[in-house]
C-alpha cells in the first residue's frame, strides 16, 4: 500500500535532513514513527503527504502509494488524496484547530475540501463521525470552541 524507498529530503542547498529512509506498509497496518525531537519524523510524513514547507523537497528516492509514485502528483491529485486516502495525526492535534472558530465550522470546511458536498450534509457527516467515536453529545462538540 505505502512504500518509501531510499528517501532523502533536503531544504534548499543544505545537506539532506533525511537520508536512506525506507518503509513498507501493508493495508490494515498502523505505523507510528517514533524518535527524538528534531530527528525528522514530521519531515518524513510531510514528504509522504507532499506538504514539505518552503524549499523542502525530496532529493532522491521514491514514495509509492498503491504502486503509484506520489512524487509525480499535481496539486489537484494531492487535494483528492490528502485527508481521504492518506493523512497524518499530529502528536498535539489540538493545536491544529483555530481557537477562535467553533469546531463544527472547521470540521465542515475540512470535509468540503476533500469531498464535494453541501455544508449541511458535511455537518451531518461530521456529527455521525463524532458519534461513531463514541464521543458524548456530538452536536454540542460541533457547537463548541476547541478549548471548551
Q: Locations of the language-model features?
A:
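ABC ATPase NBD coupling module
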Residues: 70-87, 105, 113
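Conserved beta-strand
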Residues: 4-7, 16-31, 61
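The feature captures the beta-strand-to-loop junction immediately N-terminal to the Walker
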Residues: 34-36
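Short, conserved post-Walker A segment of ABC-type ATPase nucleotide-binding domains
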Residues: 31, 42-55
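Conserved ABC ATPase "signature" region
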Residues: 121-140
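Q-loop/switch helix immediately C-terminal to the Walker
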Residues: 92, 99-113, 125
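Conserved A-loop
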Residues: 11-12, 52, 65, 72
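Conserved ABC transporter NBD signature motif
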Residues: 57-69
Amino acid at each position: 500500500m505505502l512504500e518509501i524507498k531510499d528517501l532523502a529530503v533536503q531544504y534548499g542547498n543544505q545537506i539532506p535532513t533525511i537520508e536512506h529512509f525506507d518503509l513498507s506498509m501493508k493495508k490494515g497496518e498502523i505505523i507510528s514513527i517514533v524518535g527524538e525531537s528534531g530527528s525528522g519524523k514530521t519531515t518524513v510524513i510531510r514528504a509522504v503527504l507532499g506538504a514539505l514547507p518552503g524549499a523542502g523537497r525530496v532529493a532522491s528516492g521514491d514514495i509509492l502509494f498503491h504502486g503509484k509514485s506520489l512524487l509525480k502528483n499535481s496539486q489537484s491529485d494531492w487535494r483528492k488524496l490528502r485527508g481521504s486516502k492518506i493523512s497524518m495525526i499530529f502528536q498535539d492535534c489540538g493545536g491544529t484547530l483555530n481557537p477562535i472558530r467553533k469546531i463544527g465550522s472547521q470540521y465542515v470546511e475540512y470535509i468540503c475540501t476533500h469531498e464535494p458536498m453541501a455544508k449541511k450534509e458535511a455537518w451531518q457527516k461530521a456529527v455521525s463521525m463524532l458519534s461513531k467515536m463514541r464521543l458524548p453529545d456530538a452536536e454540542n462538540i460541533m457547537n463548541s470552541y476547541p478549548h471548551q
